[in-house]
UniProtKB/Swiss-Prot annotation:
One of its GO terms (cellular component) is plasma membrane. It comes from Shewanella sp. (strain ANA-3). GO terms for molecular function: transmembrane transporter activity. The gene is mdtL. Belongs to the major facilitator superfamily. DHA1 family. MdtL (TC 2.A.1.2.22) subfamily. Residues 26-41, 86-92, 153-157, 231-242, 355-360 are periplasmic. Pfam families: MFS_1. The chain crosses the membrane at residues 5-25, 42-62, 65-85, 93-113, 132-152, 158-178, 210-230, 243-263, 278-298, 299-319, 334-354, 361-381. Its main location: membrane. This is Multidrug resistance protein MdtL.
């Protein structure tokens, strides 16, 4: 099992690394390419667009030709796109490279979840996805620090050369360590008849898509508005802001790595409901601070509750969402990724157009998301009869 965990960790980490590592070099990139920082901030959206437009394609292909070929192609594509981003001489070429980089990262992200679905049973998968989430949570803190250290001695292209090396390392892992978890023979003889029964229209899958999507939208909204809340509203300087984000990342990591142990004591449903209760509690804290009933420093408690809620609930809910699928696990993973990326981007964009304040952007998704998610968890039970029919490869 270790080989699958190692490869999937590498595949998943390319997605957040591609977002966070280059930000520290944005002023230098803008200066050299003759663009403004505001113009290059679109590189974030372009990267996500690359992910979203290819996720479904990657999942469908992974269900047809296998997981390993897609991981090799995607990791190599990420490495090549990173190299060409480093060599860009204009902002247009840079944005094209960022789009392709997003394509590679998105494919890797989708196939990693499909591999874990193939290789692990329901209980182990929930624990592993929580651990994957814990490692992912520290990337937004570690990646900019690594980027800063690199730029102390090297120019901004070195950031993308580093990402290219990372892509090549993951390519090597997948080539020499990863074993194919998807059997064509098994597919045609056993799982092909199940395609008709593995419907994406079933209420259980849709409910888990909604819950995970609301969770991702919540955490990305928090990351997006955190500078305005922490530095603008609370009056922290940049150093204090960095320390605050580092502490919340630590909270996320601790909560994520605690989840596997909690799963030994509590049911998955209980943990998901608890995570949504933490979101609701965070909304209450923010309301009380805005009314003046609590001091502004209590916002830090709210931030911790947001991060803990996401860390505890996301991996478990993702595992439940994938559990009904054997023959179509790749496409299921794709649909989850597309819903999460597109909904998050749309929510933040619409709230920006409506000029909603930073605190209200976060409050709205916390309150509404918790209410909807708790309702769905209570109304739509887990499809245990489908999970009981899973066939896990012996190699796991």
């Amino acid at each position: 099992m270790f080989r699958y965990l190692l490869c999937c960790f590498g595949l998943v980490l390319m997605y957040p690394t591609g977002i966070d590592m280059y930000l520290v070099g944005l002023p230098q990139i803008a200066n050299q390419l003759g663009a403004t920082e505001a113009q290059l901030h679109i590189a974030f959206s372009v990267y996500l667009a690359g992910m979203a437009t290819t996720m479904l394609f990657a999942g469908s292909l992974a269900d047809r030709i296998g997981r390993k070929p897609i991981t090799l192609f995607s990791a190599l594509l990420f490495a090549l796109a990173s190299y060409f981003a480093a060599r860009s001489q204009s902002s247009d070429l840079f944005l094209v490279a960022r789009f392709v980089q997003g394509v590679g990262a998105g494919c890797c992200y989708v196939v990693a979840f499909a591999i874990l679905r193939d290789a692990l049973d329901d209980k182990r998968r929930a624990k592993v996805l929580s651990m994957v989430n814990g490692v992912t949570c520290i990337i937004p803190v570690i990646a900019p620090v690594i980027g800063h250290l690199i730029m102390l001695r090297f120019p901004w292209p070195s950031l993308f050369y580093t990402m290219a090396v990372m892509g090549l390392l993951v390519f090597g892992l997948c080539l020499f360590v990863l074993r194919e978890t998807y059997s064509k023979a098994s597919f045609h003889s056993q799982t092909l008849p199940r395609v008709q029964t593995e419907s994406f229209k079933q209420g259980f899958f849709i409910s888990r898509v909604v819950i995970t999507t609301l969770g991702v939208t919540t955490i990305l909204s928090y990351v997006n508005v955190s500078p305005m809340l922490i530095m603008g509203q609370m009056g922290f300087d940049r150093g204090q802001y960095s320390n605050t984000m580092a502490m919340t990342a630590l909270v996320s990591m601790l909560a994520s790595f605690s989840t596997p142990f909690l799963l030994n004591q509590f049911k998955e449903k209980s943990l998901i409901l608890f995570s949504q209760t933490l979101f609701a509690a965070a909304a209450l804290v923010f309301i009380l601070t805005q009314l003046g009933w609590l001091g502004q420093l209590f916002n830090l408690l709210g931030f911790g509750l947001v991060c803990s809620g996401f860390a505890i609930g996301f991996g478990v809910t993702m595992s439940q969402a994938l559990s009904p699928f054997v023959a179509r696990a790749g496409v299921a993973s794709s649909l989850l990724g597309i819903a999460q990326v597109c909904t998050s981007a749309l929510y933040i964009w619409v709230m920006g157009l409506l000029e909603v304040s930073a605190i209200n952007i976060l409050l709205a998704i916390l309150a509404v998301g918790a209410l909807i998610s708790i309702t769905l968890m209570l109304a739509v039970p887990k499809l245990s009869e489908m999970v009981a029919n899973e066939q896990i490869p012996e190699s796991a």
